[in-house]
Curated annotation (Swiss-Prot):
It comes from Raphanus sativus (Radish). This is Casparian strip membrane protein 4. Homodimer and heterodimers. Residues 1-58, 131-148 are cytoplasmic. The chain crosses the membrane at residues 59-79, 110-130, 149-169. GO terms for biological process: cell wall organization. Belongs to the Casparian strip membrane proteins (CASP) family.
Amino acid sequence: MDIEKTGSRREEEEPIVQKPKLEKGKGKAHVFAPPMNYSRIMEKHKQEKVSMAGWKRGVAIFDFVLRLIAAITAMAAAAKMATTEETLPFFTQFLQFSADYTDLPTLSSFVIVNSIVGGYLTLSLPFSIVCILRPLAVPPRLFLILCDTAMMGLTMVAASASAAIVYLAHNGNSSSNWLPVCQQFGDFCKERVAPWWLPLLQRLF
């Protein structure tokens, strides 16, 4: 009996120790990612940038050559059309039969438009050189694209209108009583065909 009593007393006297509960996320070791090799990343980015600059410089050189050819073509078309004229060998006391580009407003606008386009292409060559020296520069390329689009529209309008006049001059139109003047002014029409083909080549460039 004494042993049981002493045992029960010891159980009552012994303090109950509770194990602390670990909250989630506490007491756990954090796993850190290995440090990134920034030097390798920067080197790879630099190599990609150099390769991109290389092919963009090649495109800029090709663009410069095309602009130079297109400028020469536009100037040649305007000069050829402006110097095209023919005077018939026969004349009267009051009349002298001659043909000039100023006789048709369409041909006059053709000369003006090609002069403007040729001047623009000449002035755009320095911007093209900037694109060669700085191939990753965006503003010069964007400026050239916008201006090229506008100039190509002007060239297409002038060339299309001139093509219609050239067709009427060669074939005429019976509905509007337009006589084929190329039967009388053959040399004038032959010289006028060459300037009309030059803007077509210019649009290709």
